[in-house]
Design a protein with these regions (language model features):
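ALDH superfamily catalytic-core signature
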Residues: 14-16, 132, 208-338
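Conserved C-terminal structural/oligomerization subdomain of aldehyde/semialdehyde dehydrogenase
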Residues: 35, 320-460
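Rossmann-like NAD(P) dinucleotide-binding subdomain of oxidoreductase/dehydrogenase enzymes
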Residues: 99-238
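Glycine/threonine-rich beta-strand-loop-alpha-helix active-site module
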Residues: 160, 534-648
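Carboxylate- and glycine-rich phosphate/diphosphate-binding segment that chelates Mg2+/Mn2+
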Residues: 277, 616-728
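ATP/NTP phosphate-donor binding region
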Residues: 461-550, 824-825
């Protein structure tokens, strides 16, 4: 289908507000049509427009010289050529339409859309080349562009724009896609800025400020005041001739051109002589200098006639007699203060200030002052031997300039792609925040497109991490340990345990096996029930003196946690606990990266209780006795290398420990099953662990060692639940229990048990205020998951709700059987102290690491109600199943 361009119903001349309004309306239609073009169509238009501009480079240059009387014809030809050829070459293969990129794995699509109408303000210094540049990048990005030319260069600017428009339309672009103000005025320029979608502003500080004040996005450039430093290691011939080449290019009207040169004392005379040899004139101090000042500056500002004027002409204006072919007028000055020294300003003409510096540091300081005073963010130049890396580094760090060119003519180097081919070519040079600009690079096509990012839902890559070796079965400890000596060749073992287990002989069999294998060993047996940082430091110090290559932690969660912390201290004593304990939302994206473990020692965990599952988890909790702060550490770096799950090590556990640890296993199983991070790999372990607890905890509690099978099954259940929550994590139940233990000293397993079924009811709500945030958790599903686990455990019902209620009943029966009390108050927690600490306890529970994986994301007010209900034994109200 042939696309129809909007009819041209606007007046031929845009010289008033009504005409401009009509022009912009027509351009809106044209751009809407242009926005539907394919990349192939756009590239054809871009090619033909660039070709037409390049063919007309000489006529356009002549028009610019004739109209403005500024600059050098041949250089304007080069600028036009550059604006057409280099811009086309830079972007001919750049995708600017439709899909820019597509990442199937991450579900990300980036789509280019045009911005709309570009408002372009064109200076008198580079009228035709800037018009070519801005129209070409607008065409490449499917934008319309309206040009507001400088009044002193309106004809040549419009001629350049019309030439590009005609070529573009002939190649298929909509008519009116490029427009201009025929009779420019401040009123119409302000209207352009107000009514377009983005402004490309090139010109003086006042105009750029107006663009940024328009209320529309603006890509404006600040003033340039490029300082040059010539170091005493520089190639003087290269430096001087490069500066002359740059400064005389179009009589200095490129904004990146050199405005001053600072020379080191040892080569000052050499540089000066080289400038003179090459046709530059040093203005004499006194009358000549003052005459030149008076001619060039009016009321402290550059006279509008000066930009682009030849050196000899400026000298004539000042009444200074110089050779007709003088290339540059050089004024030797000392002050960098623009209020005191006019020659420190931007001059946009072949006039250069020259400063003397005793050393490189002073030269850099001078250049820094000049940049900040007159051209912050623009360009700075250094001539130095390439091997002087320290000097180059100092210069680039001190200069607040967005373009720092080394051994390069700054006019040519700043605009890009002439002396360095990685810098994009441009005639609009951003100066960043230092220059009050929105961009700090050379403006190009990427700045004229909006990029839509289409993000499709993806589920997180999950994982399953466990110790590389998990040995189990009653009596397996000596067989598993045999591997340390006979397979791994370990020589020195360090045992970590507590006093009770050590004195009770629980480590003797391990020590005997180590002796049998000829492995030297030492033992730290001072682990506290609530392991402290101070205890861990003592153990780590003893460990460092012994220098083990294997660590064996024997005991319950406390001994294994302490062992992990000592292992970390032994391997990496430089680590800070406050950093390691930082909470995370995603363990793979945490701010702190745990260091690699195992370079010094292999870690073996041997549990003697059936509850924490710490032998196969990446977690450890340590308390700083001096501050009272608990440091919960979580990272797979802390995962033991080997776990030995031998029921012989837990046969003598007393009833109270059996009950508390056993119900802790059940809580681990249930919470890991309904976690938003649960997976098929963890759910099987959670289900099996829960079933084993229902089947074996009553007998293990009642009969103890008389039922070794029940003891072994509980030991296995503890490890399986540990592996499940090591990968799926836990939830609010544990968050609240952690704080009950910390504030009111309830044993952890019992703290979990007393709130377990209340938290389950809370989570099972099908219309919660908030749900957990994780991509693979699409909607509230805890009720179904609870019912699914219950069914695996043999609990029945007509639907999920009934199964869930029966599950709750079965859990309450189990809790009653092992002696779990009904309320927090029943455990002797003082009511007033409970209420006094409730708010702090609530906030800390909310902030607990476990909370994030809970299926229902809790409000603090909800946590508080759960605590109160569990304290007083109130019937659940606002969190019942919906």
């Amino acid at each position: 289908m042939v696309k129809k361009s909007p009819e041209n119903t606007t007046p031929a001349i845009v010289d008033n507000v009504e005409a401009l309004e009509a022009k912009l309306a027509q351009m809106r239609e044209a751009q809407a049509l242009f926005a539907t073009y394919t990349q192939e169509q756009v590239d054809k238009i871009f090619y033909e427009a660039a070709m037409a501009a390049n063919k007309a480079r000489i006529p356009l240059a002549k028009m610019a010289i004739e109209e403005t009387g500024r600059g050098v014809l041949e250089d304007k030809v080069i600028k036009n050529h550059y604006a057409a050829e280099y811009i086309y070459n830079a972007y001919k293969n750049t995708k600017t339409c439709g899909v820019l990129e597509r990442d199937e794995a991450y579900g990300i699509t980036k789509i280019a859309e045009p911005i709309g109408i570009v408002g372009a303000v064109i200076p008198t210094t580079n009228p035709t080349s800037t018009a070519i540049f801005k129209t070409l990048i607008s065409l490449k990005t499917r934008n319309a562009i309206i040009i507001s030319p400088h009044p002193a260069a309106a004809k040549c600017t419009i001629a350049a724009a019309k030439l590009v428009l005609d070529a573009a339309v002939k190649a298929g672009a909509p008519e009116g896609i490029i427009g201009w103000v025929d009779v420019p005025s401040i009123e119409l320029t302000n209207m352009v800025m107000r009514d377009v979608d983005i402004i490309l502003a090139t010109g003086g500080p006042g105009m750029v400020k107006a663009a940024y004040s328009s209320g529309k996005p603006a890509l404006g450039v600040g003033a340039g005041n490029t300082p040059v430093v010539i170091d005493d290691t520089a190639d003087v011939l290269l430096a001087v001739n490069s500066i002359i080449h740059s400064k005389t290019f179009d009589n200095g009207m490129i904004c990146a051109s050199e405005q001053s040169v600072t020379v080191i004392d040892t080569i000052y005379d050499q540089v000066k002589a080289e400038f003179q040899k090459r046709g530059c004139y040093f203005v004499k101090q006194g009358a000549e200098m003052e005459a030149l000042r008076a001619a060039m500056f009016k009321n402290g500002a550059l006279d509008h006639r000066i930009p682009g004027m030849a050196a000899a002409k400026i000298a004539e204006l000042a009444g200074i007699e110089v050779p007709a072919k003088t290339k540059i007028l050089i004024a030797e000055v000392t002050s960098t203060d623009p209020a005191k020294e006019e020659f420190s300003h931007e001059k946009l003409s072949p006039v250069l200030a020259m400063y003397h510096a005793k050393d490189f540091q002073e030269a850099v300081d001078t250049a820094e002052h000049l940049v900040l005073a007159g051209g912050p963010g623009h360009t700075a130049s250094l001539y130095v031997h390439p091997a002087q890396a320290e000097k180059i580094s100092l210069f680039e760090h001190v200069m607040k300039a967005c373009r720092i060119v080394i051994n390069t003519p700054s006019s040519h180097g700043g605009i890009g792609d002439l002396y360095n081919f990685g810098m994009k070519p441009s005639l609009t040079l951003g100066c960043g925040s230092w220059g009050g600009n929105s961009v700090s690079e050379n403006v190009g096509v990427k700045h004229l497109i909006n990029v839509k990012t289409v993000a499709e839902r993806r589920e997180n890559m999950l994982w399953f991490r466990a110790p590389e070796k998990v040995y189990f079965k009653k009596g397996s400890t000596p067989v598993a340990l045999d591997e340390l000596g006979n397979v791994m060749g370990k020589k020195r073992a360090f045992i970590v345990t507590d006093q009770f287990l050590f004195k009770n002989g629980n480590t003797r069999a391990i020590e005997a096996k180590l002796d049998e294998m000829g492995i030297a060993h030492d033992c730290f047996y001072d682990v506290e029930p609530d392991p402290s940082l101070q205890c861990a430091r003592r153990g780590a110090k003893q460990m460092a003196l012994f220098e083990p290559d294997v660590i064996i932690a024997v005991g319950g969660g406390s001994a294994m946690d302490a062992g992990k912390i000592m292992w970390m201290m032994y391997e990496h004593p430089e680590c800070k606990f406050e950093d390691m304990a930082m909470d995370f939302m995603d363990i793979r994206k945490r701010i702190f990266t745990f260091p690699e473990m195992g370079k010094k020692a292999y870690f073996v965990a041997v549990p003697t209780s059936s509850g924490t599952g710490s032998e196969c988890t990446p977690f450890a909790i340590i308390t700083d006795k001096e501050t009272g702060i608990k440091w919960p550490l979580a990272d797979y770096a802390l995962l033991p290398n080997m776990a030995i799950v031998d029921a012989d090590n837990c046969m003598t556990a007393p009833r109270g420990l059996t009950a508390a640890s056993g119900i802790d296993v059940m809580t681990h199983a249930i919470e890991s099953y309904v976690s938003i991070m649960a997976s098929d790999y963890t759910k099987g372990l959670s289900e099996r662990a829960a079933k084993l607890v229902f089947e074996n905890l009553p007998s293990s509690f009642t009969n103890g060692a008389k039922d070794p099978h029940a003891r072994e099954e509980m030991h296995n259940a503890s490890c399986m639940a540990g592996m499940a929550f090591a990968n799926a994590f836990l939830g609010l139940n544990h968050s609240m229990a952690h704080k009950l233990g910390a504030f009111h000293h309830l044993p952890h397993g019992l703290a979990n048990a007393v709130i377990l079924t209340r938290v389950m009811r809370y989570n099972a709500a099908e219309a919660p205020v908030k749900m957990g945030t994780f991509s693979q958790y699409p909607y509230p599903n805890a009720l179904h998951n609870y019912a699914e686990m219950a069914k695996y455990c043999g609990i029945e019902g007509k639907d999920d709700k009934e199964v869930f209620e029966n599950f709750i009943t079965k859990l309450e029966e189990l809790k009653d059987f092992i002696g779990v009390k009904k309320t927090i108050a029943d455990y002797g927690v003082d009511e007033q102290y409970f209420l006094d600490t409730l708010d702090e306890m609530t906030e800390q529970a909310f902030n607990d690491q476990c909370t994030g994986a809970n299926p229902r994301y809790p409000l603090m007010s909800e946590i508080k109600e759960l605590y109160l209900d569990a304290y007083y034994g109130r019937e659940p109200q606002d969190y019942a199943v919906c």
